[in-house]
């Protein structure tokens, strides 16, 4: 399938600089650039399929991009197309971790029970607000005493502590745990860091 590209897209596809940022409006063809760059790296730069990873923010978008790549270039094999969390999950499995992800319904249930002690009406929006606060705090890697939640500090701390205690007891992970653990491994284990530097030669993020 022939794809019509303008000069800007061709330049982005064939550019040889180590790090490249493509800034363009929605619908302008950034995804088209990415799948064409993957093909260019393989066909022209002789990269191996396993040298390339393509990251996007949802599983649906990753699957769509993978299918577009295969259909456009008539490929049966493709590089890794996935989400950040999907990549982190694979890395941790490769390093010997056993991972069971907590179900979203259970997350909501834990928070609902706690909030019900403080509020007569606990709706899904309030539960999501608490879970978003927990996620923001965890990924900030900061001290809980310095974190400013959008709910009361007392309620937030209780929600956070009971949520983490439940996960620890049941040996469960959430998606933030994946990214935090991978970051820790890469920062504190030079063998692992250098191993993935050698493994992932081309990283494309949509």
Regions found by a protein language model. Give the residues of each.
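Short secondary-structure boundary/capping elements
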Residues: 4, 30-33, 184-188
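Walker A/P-loop
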Residues: 17-37
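A basic/glycine-biased coupling hinge at the interface between accessory DNA-binding modules
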Residues: 41-200
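Hydrophobic residues in beta-strands of the RecA-like P-loop NTPase core, especially within AAA+ ATPase
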Residues: 204-205
